[in-house]
From Swiss-Prot:
The lineage of its organism: Eukaryota, Metazoa, Chordata, Craniata, Vertebrata. It comes from Homo sapiens. The gene is HELB. Changing S1021A: Does not affect subcellular location. The modification Phosphoserine is found at S967, S971, S1048, S1058. A motif (Nuclear export signal) lies at residues 1055-1078. This is DNA helicase B.
Length: 1087
């Protein structure tokens, strides 16, 4: 990789576009290019409000700049939103050593100045280039330039009179072409004033005209608002441009706050950073000290929340950190200024960024409203549900593993239902308990199988789900969180299918059955497209894929749910179809520790307002690293709800092969050194002992190093490379498809990938120009989400792609047109997700129509597709993936995991805990013992959040009682265990039956829970991009939370709620009870 010098230089002069466009195409292979982070999360309601979402950063180009001060022509590599020889730019650059294609790399973004006089004496050449860029034919360009030379002089030609000159040229040449002169003077006047030339609609022409009218926009907006700049100058109205130009000359500080930019121009998450303002000295001179201090304080507040994960900062701490920039009085005034413009919120000497404050409050309000709704009990025998798990194939068996990217949703053919008093009275979930239990009693263990003792924690967890509107389940990998939840809803699905089928068969046998009766098969076919009622979600694409694979049900990312609502609002007027998730009654969120409060707030609010949501289930591990974004959602909800019997921890490991891994994870959470069942010392000539072949938790000990030694870093890399090379000879690491290296630092990942690439494929990860190299056999991962339809080669044949999709073709049914439609839907709906791992199985370069390279990639879960290599790099930004950082691999798991500790540095026990729990069967830890001990002993940095406080306050004020369980009854064989409903043939009146005439809209209070969009405006994400895990201020290094208790949370003691104090008595209405009936009575029957 090219080494860069910290010395910065300012270049100013004409911008010359790249000459060699073919060579430019390879720039996407450079690994040292500044990463373009995906746009920040945007709330669906913000998008629906008509706001303009930020675009991506401009692409990187190689250009030449002729410096006006030294007359030197410098080759520069960086992000230039517009190019052309008629522009002058001013930009900060740093020298780059080791690159043959460019001398300097841009720091930040350029300012643009139009050469309105076309830079004499080059007017002719610049004008020709400009007209060519404006899609004017070469003949017309030559005719125009000849005419200019005859009529006037090139010296008089400039951009200010170019439009009029072109109009005059077209008018005069038009007269010559006409046989008869214009007969009406008014017609001539019309031609002079109203004639619109075709080139006036081209982007280069509009940019030039904008620069003439609004020079400040061209100078400052590319630096201040690089993601919005091109949209503003290309699509923004003249009024908007005029207002922004005026603000840049009077109150530029307003561009530093997204709330103001949204209010004025509907720009979403659009605000300039303080660092960007510092590059515009003339703008700083227009600001008062108060305005500058407010921008500094706002920037510091966002930085603290981003790096430490806080959702608020105490006033004293904030002012203290700014003591070197402003006095205490100035800080107080700045804070008041920020509060007055609505950017921050005060509460008890705490300062919140408004978006985080609103997110935590909105979550608390939504959860409280769910808990106040009339209770909905799933009347199932949870012990028999759990017992049925042991009589079926394991969820993770190869036979049951589903394609993570199948297009067709694996829906319930007769989806589960809940109490809906308006139109769903006959569904099985709303029937009396006697009907449910009668069917459940049919589920029995096979006689030749030994009954497995049930996990009482799992029993209690399922009872919570059946009884409570909100349930939080925490536990380590292998405790069965996902298994029991998916099994519960599959069980209910089977019961409903069985009852519907039996009822249909009985009715068909009736002699009086109508000829119009639809058979069970036909009915099932009609209901195949029934709406989703149990929605499984995860925070990342990879986690959603694993959830889909484990459960056999379709799973979505939270962002997909959010954006699907926006997409629906754009088409609902024409399609007249309901929102895809409008029938959701149960929301399951897996990997809850990774969920940010902003995304969760948005999705929960959408489902509460626009679906029939009645149950929320959150799964995760409270000891894992929290979200990389501010907040600590899972831990806050768990600690708040456990006292109300709505949260529980599963403590028993159900993977026999991973017991030692689970035990060591517990030790690590208690800051104790783990117990290894094998050790391997790395020396000059390490050999792999046979004794570790059947071990589970292996310590690969690196030699201790002297930190003061100059060769310490070199020795560490040498020892690490030797350790990795040695382990690659081990049987469990022979297959890269079932093993994964994990490291904390990205530089360690690079070294491991180099070693693995050479071992598995025989080539290096980079060439002599530090460009990434990919080939057959490479293990790669996507670092961005992208749809398959955006990645397909332009000239791919239908038959070829159909063959690639054979693994999923069983989901395509019907006629050939139906198949074609399904195929298009497949390509449009399938996403390659951030974090998803693929293997390259084929690499073809087609030179027929230019150099086009295609890769065939396989995710080893049923999806194999051929994609365009350049598109794959552009949209997915693929990287080698034999080694991943712990933060990017969190939410995934593998059979064998190798964790490289490296230097302890900022690592603490949660990093080690999260890493080792990624392994299902075997874990290797490569580390110096002292560094491993330091990391385990280091406490995590507690996050300051207010979700717990908001939720406790809201629940207390609303009088929501602790959860209780229906029909309490001690189960056989465990007098002290959790209760389960009895399988009684007699009907049992349950709470949901008593509230049959209470609609959900009456039970909730949306006006109390939700604010208007204007009131809950969210700010932009923190400024700056930090993508390297080993940087001092990496966001990932601060992903901590305050799990300080060494022991696991105590088991929940379930106590039945006293009817005397139950607020649910207010909802009991005995006067409207209606007996449950499968079919409506005829006129002569009693009602």
């Amino acid at each position: 990789m090219a080494r860069s010098s910290p010395y910065l230089r300012q270049l100013q002069g004409p911008l010359l576009p790249p000459r060699d466009l073919v060579e430019e195409d390879d720039d996407y292979l450079n690994d040292d290019v500044e990463e373009d982070e995906e746009s920040v999360f945007i709330d669906a309601e913000e998008l629906c409000s008509g706001g303009v979402k930020a675009g991506s950063l401009p692409g990187c180009l190689r250009v030449s700049i002729c410096d006006e001060n030294t007359q030197e022509t410098c080759k520069v590599f960086g992000r230039f939103p517009i190019t052309g020889a008629w522009w002058r730019v001013k930009v900060q650059v740093k020298p780059v050593v080791g690159s043959r294609s460019y001398q300097y790399q841009v720091q930040g973004f350029p300012s643009y100045f139009l050469q309105s006089d076309m830079s004499p004496p080059n007017q002719k050449h610049i004008c020709a280039l400009f007209l060519k860029e404006c899609e004017v034919s070469s003949d017309d360009v030559n005719k125009f330039l000849t005419w200019v030379k005859e009529v006037s002089n090139y010296k008089n030609l400039n951009f200010e009179n170019l439009r009029e000159t072109l109009r005059t040229f077209h008018k005069e040449t038009g007269r010559k072409d006409q046989k008869q002169p214009t007969q009406n003077g008014q017609e001539e006047l019309f031609l002079d004033n109203e004639m619109s030339l075709p080139l006036e609609n081209t982007i280069p022409f509009r940019n030039v005209m904008t620069a003439l009218q609004f020079p400040k926009i061209m100078e400052f907006l590319p630096v201040l608002l690089p993601r919005h700049f091109k949209w503003i100058i290309g699509s923004g109205s003249k009024e908007m441009l005029k207002e922004i130009e005026e603000i840049l000359g009077t109150h530029p500080w307003k561009l530093g706050f997204s709330k103001i930019t949204y209010r004025e121009w509907k720009l979403l998450r659009c605000e300039a950073s303080w660092i960007a303002f510092c590059q515009c000295e003339s703008l700083l001179q227009l600001m008062t000290d108060l305005e500058k201090n407010a921008l500094i304080m706002y920037s510091r507040l966002k930085q603290i929340c981003r790096e430490d994960g806080h959702t608020y900062v105490e006033v004293n701490d904030l002012t203290l950190t700014l003591s070197n920039h402003m006095s205490f009085h100035a800080a107080s005034e700045s804070l008041k200024f920020l509060k007055d413009i609505g950017v921050v919120t005060y509460e008890k000497s705490c300062v919140f960024p408004y978006d985080l404050y609103h997110a935590e409050r909105a979550i608390a309000f939504s959860i409280c409203d769910l808990m106040k709704k009339p209770p909905w009990h799933l009347c199932v025998d949870v012990e028999k549900v759990l017992a049925s798990i042991h009589t079926t194939k394991p969820e993770n068996s190869s036979d049951d593993a589903l394609n993570e990217s199948k297009p067709d949703e694996v829906r319930l053919e007769n989806p589960v239902d809940v109490v809906d008093t308006q139109d769903n009275g006959d569904h099985i979930w709303t029937n009396g308990e006697n009907e449910i239990n009668a069917e459940i009693s049919e589920v029995q263990l096979d006689q030749d199988q030994v009954e497995v003792p049930l996990d009482r924690d799992q029993v209690a967890a399922l009872e919570m789900i059946c009884s409570n509107p909100v349930t939080v389940i925490s536990g380590k990998g292998g405790c069965g969180k996902t298994t029991i939840v998916s099994r519960l809803f599959k069980h209910i699905e089977q019961l409903e299918e069985r009852e519907v089928k039996k009822a249909c068969e009985d009715f068909e046998q009736d002699q009086n059955a109508s000829e119009e009766w639809i058979t069970f098969t036909e009915q099932s076919q009609l209901e195949a497209d029934k709406a989703i009622e149990v929605l499984l979600t995860a925070p990342t694409g990879k986690a959603a894929g694993l959830l889909r694979q484990k459960t056999g049900l379709h799973a979505y990312t939270l962002c997909q749910v959010n954006y699907s609502f926006y997409s629906w609002t754009q088409t609902m007027m024409t399609t007249n179809k309901p929102w895809k998730f409008s029938s959701v009654r149960v929301l399951v969120v897996d990997e809850g520790s990774l969920v940010s409060v902003g995304i969760f707030k948005s999705v929960l609010n959408l489902l509460c307002e626009h679906s029939k949501l009645s149950k929320l289930i959150i799964l995760g591990d409270i000891r894992q690293l929290p979200s990389i974004e501010p907040g600590n959602l899972l831990k806050d909800l768990f600690e708040t709800l456990k006292s109300r019997n709505c949260a529980i921890e599963l403590k028993t490991n159900h993977r026999a092969e991973s017991q030692l891994i689970v035990d060591n994870a517990t030790r690590i959470s208690r800051r104790q050194f783990p117990k290894f069942d094998a050790e391997l010392n790395i020396s000059d000539n390490p050999t792999l002992p046979i004794s570790i072949q059947d071990k589970t938790f292996i310590f690969v000990r690196l030699p201790e190093e002297d930190a003061s030694s100059q060769s310490s870093k070199t020795n560490h890399h040498s020892c690490l490379y030797s350790a990795v090379k040695t382990l690659l000879q081990e049987n469990n690491l022979q297959n890269a498809k079932t093993s994964q290296f994990i490291a904390f630092r990205r530089q360690d990942c690079d070294l491991i990938n180099d070693c693995c690439c050479k071992h598995y494929t025989g080539h290096l990860t980079k060439d002599h120009q530090s460009r990434l190299v990919f080939g057959i056999g490479d293990k790669i991962c996507c670092t961005r989400n992208a749809y398959l339809s955006d990645l397909l080669p332009e000239n791919i044949s239908g038959s070829q792609q159909n063959n690639d999709l054979d693994a999923s073709s069983e989901d395509f049914s019907g006629t050939l047109p139906d198949f074609a439609k399904n195929k298009r839907d497949f390509e449009s709906n399938v996403r390659l997700c951030n974090g998803e791992i693929f293997f390259i199985t084929n690499d073809v370069t087609d030179v027929t129509f230019g150099k086009r390279r295609s890769l065939t990639i396989n995710n080893m879960a049923g999806l194999e597709v051929t994609v365009d290599f350049k598109k794959l790099m552009k949209y997915c930004r693929i990287k080698h993936a034999w080694a991943r950082t712990i933060h990017t691999f969190q939410g995934s798991e593998e059979q064998t995991v190798v964790y490289v500790v490296g230097k302890a540095g900022r690592q603490h026990w949660q990093h080690v805990y999260t890493a080792v729990t990624r392994g299902r069967c075997r874990v290797y830890v490569i580390a110096e013992e002292s560094q491993l001990r330091n990391a385990i002993m280091k406490n995590s940095f507690p996050r300051k959040t207010r979700l717990k406080h908001f939720l406790q306050s809201k629940l207390s004020s609303s009088g929501a009682p602790p959860a209780d369980f229906p029909s309490p009854r001690k189960s056989s064989g465990d007098s002290g265990g959790p209760s389960t409903p009895s399988a009684s043939p007699l009907p049992v009146v349950t709470d949901h039956a008593m509230t049959n005439d209470v609609t959900w809209s009456e039970a909730s209070s949306p006006d109390e829970r939700t604010l208007t969009f204007a009131e809950r405006w969210q700010l932009s994400s923190p400024d700056g991009v930090d993508t390297d895990d080993d940087l001092p201020k990496s966001r990932a290094s601060k992903r901590t939370c305050g799990v300080n208790d060494d022991e696991s949370p105590s088991k929940i003691f379930m106590v039945g709620e006293s009817p005397q104090v139950s607020s649910r008595l207010q909802n009991l209405r005995l006067n409207n009870l209606i007996p449950r009936q499968l079919f409506k009575p005829t006129d002569n029957q009693e009602t």
